[in-house]
Design a protein with these regions (language model features):
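Glycine-rich beta-strand-to-loop/alpha-helix junction loops that act as flexible
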Residues: 44-48
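Structured mid-to-C-terminal alpha-helical surface segments
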Residues: 1-42, 52-60, 64, 68-266
């Protein structure tokens, strides 16, 4: 595979240069993971899944988010992880730089930077955020990713739509109008008609209602908190002007749609 040629093909699909490079790098890692011995020890999450299920280049993301399943986040295990996914013909995958501790809003994990190279002297540098999927009672979904450089799909586990919805909502509930994860709002709106209501309520129980660090104990509490956040004028103003509105929908319509979704669950 020639990295430079593949990037040109991806750009022809509507991606800019940065996101074309990221898409190719992500697909290389996903393909390598699917072929590796660790394919049942990881679950893919975040923007890569959102972009894949929506099939919308506007939801493209530069990073790759992975949670380990029954696999340690220790540095030595991360290095073994890289060794295991360096398994594609004529493609080299290696870690560069240090393994970083990662602490963001409502997220703790590690970050690694990787270099992907072909045999033509081309290379890409990207980053992977790594965490741990701790609650094994929340089943992961088997999903086939379209890989941009081959007609063969890559089958891996992903966070379900219901889990993604719940985790995005959980962050919004915790930080309220101080949340800066505006893209999550448009993701919530997109996911709302796609989730299974029964499984969603199970995720709410696990990640929100039964979490002693959360203040919400039922749907009424969620609606009350979300309504208060959405009524904040500063939050609405920032949401209206954000560049992360990948749906290109009116932000007021999006907020109303999310609230309507919650009220329908009552």
């Amino acid at each position: 595979m020639n990295i430079k040629e593949q990037i040109a093909k991806i750009r022809a699909q509507g991606y800019d240069q940065i996101h074309a490079e990221a898409r190719l790098c992500q697909d290389i890692i996903i393909q390598a993971l699917a072929k590796s011995t660790l394919n049942q020890n990881v679950t893919i999450k975040g923007g890569v899944v959102m972009r894949s299920i929506s099939k919308d280049a506007r939801r493209a993301t530069r990073d790759l988010d992975i949670d380990f399943i029954r696999y340690s986040l220790e540095d030595s295990h991360i290095d073994n992880f890289i060794k295991e996914i360096n398994c594609l013909d004529r493609i080299s995958i290696m870690r560069i730089g240090d393994i970083e501790e990662l602490k963001q809003q409502d997220y703790h994990g590690k970050r690694i930077h990787i270099k992907v190279s072909d045999t033509y002297g081309n290379s890409l540098i990207s980053k992977i955020d790594l965490g741990v999927h701790k609650d094994l009672s929340i089943k992961q979904e088997e999903y086939c990713f379209d890989i941009c450089f081959t007609e063969t799909n890559a089958s891996l586990l992903i966070n379900s739509k219901e889990q993604m919805f719940t985790e995005k909502l959980r962050s919004l509930l915790k930080f309220g109008s101080f949340s800066t994860r505006y893209k999550d709002i448009f993701d919530l709106y997109y996911l709302s008609p796609l989730v299974d209501k029964k499984f969603l309520m199970l995720c709410f129980e696990k990640y929100i209602f039964n979490d002693t660090g959360m203040k919400e104990n039922n749907l009424e509490d969620i609606i009350r908190r979300v309504t208060k956040t959405f009524e904040n004028s500063s939050y609405r103003r920032k949401l209206k002007t954000t560049e992360t509105n990948w749906l290109k929908k009116d932000s007021n319509e999006v907020l109303e749609g999310i609230l309507h979704f919650f009220k329908k669950q009552m």
